[in-house]
Amino acid sequence: MARAPQPRRGAAAPGNALRALLRCNLPPGAQRVVVSAVLALLVLINLISDGSVVCAEALWDHVTMDDQELGFKAGDVIEVMDATNRAWWWGRAADCEGWFPASFVRLRVNQDEPADDEAPRARDGGAEAGGAEAQSSKDQMRTNVINEILSTERDYIKHLRDICEGYVRQCRKRADMFSEEQLRTIFGNIEDIYRCQKAFVKALEQRFNRERPHLSELGACFLEHQADFQIYSEYCNNHPNACVELSRLTKLSKYVYFFEACRLLQKMIDISLDGFLLTPVQKICKYPLQLAELLKYTHPQHRDFKDVEAALHAMKNVAQLINERKRRLENIDKIAQWQSAIEDWEGEDLLVRSSELIYSGELTRVTQPQAKSQQRMFFLFDHQLIYCKKDLLRRDVLYYKGRLDMDGLEVVDLEDGKDRDLHVSIKNAFRLHCGTTGDSHLLCTRKPEQKQRWLKAFAREREQVQLDQETGFSITELQRKQAMLNASKQQVTGKPKAKPPGLRGTPCRLKLFVPKAVGRPCYLMRQKHPALPSSRPQQQVLVLAEPRRKPSTFWHSISRLAPFRNTQESAALQKAQREDSQMHRSCPVRATAKLVTMDTSNSQLSGEVKGAQLLRVVILFSNV
Amino acid sequence: MPEQSNDYRVAVFGAGGVGKSSLVLRFVKGTFRESYIPTVEDTYRQVISCDKSICTLQITDTTGSHQFPAMQRLSISKGHAFILVYSITSRQSLEELKPIYEQICEIKGDVESIPIMLVGNKCDESPSREVQSSEAEALARTWKCAFMETSAKLNHNVKELFQELLNLEKRRTVSLQIDGKKSKQQKRKEKLKGKCVIM
């Protein structure tokens, strides 16, 4: 060997320094300097001490006549043994060792996995095939799927542990940086998820048959734990808030360094915190896939077959439920906004009892005394029906006129002809009859199909209410208040920058119009927002276009195409994205420059810092 | 602006079985598995160059989420670039991309500045082709995105796909190749050679 790489050194010293840093309160400037220096050192030493597993793939041929240099062909895998120098690394390929230019290779990502994971698998298969020729390939596939379920579960647990121990715990120690509320926003209920998954993976391990993995019976595990998975709902619903809060915090370099320190200390892979925070969302979507795969390779005679089948169904339901709740929650912002755009709103907020628009359209209301008929816009939500009057001139402006409580109402389909009570001839009519008060409302549509649609919508409203009762769906008061607040903020900020896309060519039935300023919405009057300008509120009105598809898919597309398109939700997302793109525009080069200038202001440390800067590049290369 | 975790996030979408995982695996690890393709990891990473510096390409796998749009939205909102994969042997898989594209539009707003690549995978199986490339090209034009046919199995166009996608990024210079400072390194090489001899 021409030159041995550095001897192995423990990572304890810099690790301790980091730990101390997280605890102490250095002035931010000094902290930054020390952190970047320590981080670089830590990773470098880690890299060297773990030299045996760092593999790089050659991007180009490296042809050399120098016997101290390592020659290789593009595509060769090189074991990197020393990367202390930025440009020239020491490594081994085949049986040779030598220097090679670092730029000629790229580090293999996912180094934690064996470089060639096909080989051992093939060997396993071969051995088993030799032992028992009869073992069908289906059993082998089942083994594969079971191994995968177990291994992804272990990986996932590790992720969760890393987040809980590496981030949450560290953040808790810094009450000066994070309030308890902020932590709750960023991390949601991830600690509960961690707890549940720990129990789950334990149950899986117990049922795992080590000798003959394909005989493992995992189905029951999923069935036993299916109710626990519902806590993912809260997590998924909170995730957008977490992203907004994170991108807000990471505008401050102190937080960026803190999170980076947490990551390195926990020796986590090179993904930013928001990447880690997305894993539970991804995970809960994957269970149905894995179970479907498992079922595919489970023989109907297998003892686990029925359980796997039931588990697949259960986990699909769980994911669907979570998805549905997420969607509903996205809707409440839209509903809040819709309400705040209605003039002369009276009574309690819509969200107190409702969370979904079921149907809407124009109906003729025939009132009792003089059989007068009025054209009104009706909006059917779960639990209540709101009716509004269109402005005579501005047809897109709506005035609140009243509401009906759907819980006590009976819908009566009326035949065309003379109405006995009102003595008028009616067509396409139905009656909403209130059992307790005896009130009755006669409503007519223009066309018979419209009446059918309304009748179906009323039925659907009842189904929805019942379903929500069964699954225990409700909006918390906090979520409701937040939505109303967002709606009022929306009024202040005015129209979101991006124009509502997707109106073209999409099967969109509810179209949104954003006219110019009109009167100030009533909701805002009642809320205490003295600073609100009355000049720029925004009106949003729904106009119902003719549905073309069959009603069953109607609600699906409504939810997807977002009747209330200009929402706070999307505004918040867009804001987050703008922030994202801003932070990325100033990517490494400028950021590096800034870091150096910042640091060199402390002249004593400047030399060291430039060194650290060099090493930072290595950090990016070497996080494995 | 302080230094940010400079990662570039790519989300890969597509119906089940079109080869999202295979594409990503082929790109990141260079492997392809004929018989059994496991659900890939949640997030892959790859070192790339960005504005002449180094950053992490973060590839988010969305496997499993195509049935759950509200959760898919969470992945979309964090992505910088998108790969929409269908299989050329399944028209249905192309159809299933449409709602995903609409969602991206809805969440991202101005899609023209966002790198989106429509990808027809499995082009090695052209005997059972259901989607002609001309059709997909036309769709890509209406979507104002780029289009490419790939084969993860034959490693055809896989690297090119990611390179093209990064080329579409106009707000910064991102590239798979980390060779921004070659000439400098050339100089450094001379220097280092001297050092090695001394030792």
Curated annotation (Swiss-Prot), chain B:
Residues binding GTP are 14-21, 33-39, 61-65, 121-124, 152-153
Lipidated positions (S-geranylgeranyl cysteine) are C196
Stated EC number for the protein is 3.6.5.-
Q: Which GO terms describe its cellular component?
A: plasma membrane
How does the record classify its membrane topology? Lipid-anchor
Q: List this protein's GO terms for biological process.
A: signal transduction
Q: Name one Pfam family in it.
A: Ras
Write the record's keywords in alphabetical order, separated by commas: Cell membrane, GTP-binding, Hydrolase, Lipoprotein, Membrane, Methylation, Nucleotide-binding, Phosphoprotein, Prenylation, Ubl conjugation
Where it mainly occurs, coarsely classed, is membrane
* Catalytic reactions of this protein: GTP + H2O = GDP + phosphate + H(+)
In the record, which positions carry Phosphoserine? S35, S126
* GO molecular function terms attached to this record: GDP binding; GTP binding; GTPase activity
Q: Propeptide-annotated positions?
A: 197-199
Q: In which tissues is it expressed?
A: Highly expressed in brain.
Quote the protein name from its UniProt record.
Answer: GTP-binding protein Di-Ras2
